[in-house]
Design a protein with these regions (language model features):
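Short alpha-helical segments enriched in small residues
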Residues: 1-164
Length: 164
């Protein structure tokens, strides 16, 4: 993944006086890694949570157990709850989240490998997008992290305006 999008997101946040956090599942910290590869990231990026299990989603991000049971971990409502949880936990102005299936298998709800949900929690609301990605595990993880960062970039450049 290229770090230029991470640098652009950090610069846009810096210019607007905004802070950023992340809640990651299938990306396993790739968003945080891309952001912290950039010198000065600590002025903007407050931190991230790798919530690889439902237990951590529940206990750290406060994703309701009933939501996980009803919708499954790989779903728009859970991506939304993860982003909100990261925003509350860190006090960040913006929080990204990613949950999905990087492979090698789909889930018991019929979601195939490459099903990914990204979300951005902002003061105006929460924006959620669904992806259907191809590639191997590493490619799906990298594309998911890149898409989440691009989602932040699009929000910061007013290309996303309708949140829940």
């Amino acid at each position: 993944m290229q770090t230029n999008i991470a640098a652009e997101v950090l610069q846009l946040c810096r210019e607007r006086g905004l802070t950023l956090a992340a809640a990651e599942s299938c990306t396993g910290g790739l968003i945080a890694k891309e952001l912290t590869d950039i010198p000065g990231a600590s002025q903007v990026f407050l931190g991230g949570v790798v919530s690889y299990t439902n237990h951590v989603k529940e206990q750290v991000l406060r994703v309701p157990a009933a939501l996980l049971e009803r919708c499954g971990a790989v779903s728009a409502p859970v991506a939304r709850a993860m982003a909100l949880g990261a925003r509350v936990l860190t006090g960040a102005d913006l929080a990204l989240s990613v949950t999905g299936l990087a492979g090698p298998d789909g889930d018991d709800r019929g979601n195939p490998v490459g099903t990914v949900f990204t979300a951005l929690a902002a003061p105006e609301g929460v924006f959620v997008e669904q992806l259907a990605l191809g590639g191997d595990r590493a490619q799906i993880r990298a594309l998911s992290a890149h898409h989440a960062l691009d989602m932040a970039r699009r929000y910061l450049t007013h290309q996303i305006t309708e949140g829940e």
